[in-house]
Amino acid sequence: AADDYIYVVRAGDSPWNITTRYLKSIDHWPQLQQYNRIISPDTIPPGTQLRIPAGWLRSRARPVRITDLQGQVEVLNRGVAQMLERGMTIVEGSLLRTGANGSLTLLLPDGSRSLVGPDTELRLSTARQIEASSGGQIKMELLRGYVENKVTDKRKSGGRFIIDTPSGVTAVRGTRFRVTEAGRVLRTETLEGEVVASAVPPGRDGDMVDHQ
């Protein structure tokens, strides 16, 4: 698949120890062997490239740092509201709200950056870093307003960058783009590279769509 992580085999590697180091469940080791058609698991030549589905990779939640902030911005986390300042960090599950003159820039675990515009409500659903690579698994929910993103190249890292809105889903690897949500109208502007946007019919949940 397009979002597979490419792992380069080192001396002494086997499907078993790769699984124990980097994957979510030990149950993946026979699947890893099958997926890559490994005939002799104990004698994989160093330098061999193995494909690992992104969904199998173990990851850790990472804080997101605010590198710039203007005007009034608050975060709601576990029912508690707090005014934000530059240099502070937020975590998965945080809901951001900017005022009419408010904006902020987020530095994400994989080095991607997101500029959250005025009059915007944005939930940071997922902010994780893959243990096997520098790739990030990022998911945001844009409830209203706009967010402009400069995303690091996620090809071969197992990384994903998803923005979910009431009107659709936008997914990307390695580009710069802006997403605006206004009354169930989704507008995606590509500033550099390519993105994929998927419209969601009223009353239905969106499926995650990856750029390929």
Task: Go through the PLM ranges and name each one.
Residues G12-S14, R37, Q49, E121:
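Disulfide-stabilized cysteine-rich extracellular repeat microdomains
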Residues P15-W16, W29, P41, R113:
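Internal amphipathic alpha-helical segments of the cytochrome P450 catalytic fold
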Residues A2, R21-A61:
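Extracellular LysM carbohydrate-binding repeats and other cell-envelope/extracellular binding modules
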